[in-house]
């Protein structure tokens, strides 16, 4: 038998999808209070989700107790798997968690532009459209490679196995799911995804392109997961646990307007905000 092959295990290059907990302050109690406020109504929402602690937003002379943040995340049932830091933040390597290298979707320049836009938006009048207020300041969806650990935003994502096999039909880069998805099932499409049945609470549909759901959406829908800001979500009945495009999230903690809740809608990104508009089908 070749020494490079084994019936017992394999070592392969791969990718996993995870979240970034983006630290903006060294005030642990402020983070604890904000986590409690955001998730006290849905304490199981991110249960067992893996997360990497991202400290790159901290100033060069600021330090934070990574073990305490890991315990904080563990208290809300998230699973810290590593730390993302800039090269000058050598102190982060002292953590018991592995130091990971992230490849952001838009790069550091875009992050700076985002911060400037956020400051400008804070001084401007509030928009009146059905916009989302995503918790992206706390969580940003990323993907990672095993060589660096977990987080990296430009890598492919390997989905978790579904609870039961789901029959799929694919054409070019479009995947079609013709059965309802029950809690615990997850579908991943490298292009567009079309779902013909119910997406139940606890189910998850993920696509690098657009998502079309011709039934109620009650679970999670994540479109444009590889950073495609032009991706959209279409559904005939919007009742989601979570919607996301290119890492910008909206959860049930931010109630949907009555004119879109339970209605046919389309969802897209505009200036880093999720826009939700009723679909006029007649």
Curated annotation (Swiss-Prot):
This is Probable septum site-determining protein MinC. The keyword Cell cycle applies. Belongs to the MinC family. The gene is minC. InterPro entries: CAP/MinC_C (IPR016098), MinC (IPR013033), MinC_C_sf (IPR036145), MinC_N (IPR007874), Septum_form_inhib_MinC_C (IPR005526). GO terms for biological process: cell morphogenesis; division septum assembly; regulation of cell division; regulation of cell septum assembly. Residues 108-127 are annotated as: Disordered. Residues 118-127 have a biased composition (Low complexity). Pfam families: MinC_C, MinC_N. Cell division inhibitor that blocks the formation of polar Z ring septums. Rapidly oscillates between the poles of the cell to destabilize FtsZ filaments that have formed before they mature into polar Z rings. Prevents FtsZ polymerization. Interacts with MinD and FtsZ. It comes from the Bacteria. Keywords: Cell cycle, Cell division, Septation.
């Amino acid at each position: 038998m070749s020494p490079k092959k084994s019936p017992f295990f394999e070592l392969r290059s791969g990718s996993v999808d995870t979240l970034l907990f983006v630290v903006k302050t060294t005030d642990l109690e402020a983070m604890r209070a904000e986590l409690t406020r955001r998730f006290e109504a849905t304490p199981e929402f991110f249960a067992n989700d893996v997360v990497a602690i991202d400290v790159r937003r901290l100033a060069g002379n600021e330090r934070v107790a990574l073990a305490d943040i890991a315990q904080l995340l563990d208290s809300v049932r998230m699973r810290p798997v590593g730390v993302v830091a800039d090269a000058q933040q050598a102190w982060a390597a002292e953590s018991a968690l592995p130091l990971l290298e992230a490849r952001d979707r838009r790069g550091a320049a875009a992050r700076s532009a985002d911060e400037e836009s956020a400051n400008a938006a804070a001084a401007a009048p509030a928009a009146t459209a059905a916009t989302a207020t995503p918790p992206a300041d706390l969580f940003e969806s990323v993907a990672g490679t095993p060589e660096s650990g977990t987080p990296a935003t430009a890598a492919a994502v390997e989905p978790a196995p579904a609870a039961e096999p789901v029959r799929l039909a694919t054409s070019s880069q479009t995947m079609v799911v013709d059965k309802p998805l029950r809690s615990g099932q997850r579908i991943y499409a490298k292009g567009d995804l079309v779902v013909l049945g119910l997406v139940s609470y606890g189910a998850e549909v993920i696509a690098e392109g657009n998502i079309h759901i011709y039934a109620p959406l009650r679970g999670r829908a994540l479109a444009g997961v590889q950073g495609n800001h032009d991706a959209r979500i279409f559904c005939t009945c919007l009742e989601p646990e979570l919607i996301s495009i290119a890492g910008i999230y909206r959860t049930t903690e931010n109630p949907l307007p009555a004119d879109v809740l339970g209605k046919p809608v389309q969802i897209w990104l505009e200036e880093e905000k999720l826009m939700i508009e009723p679909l006029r089908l007649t």
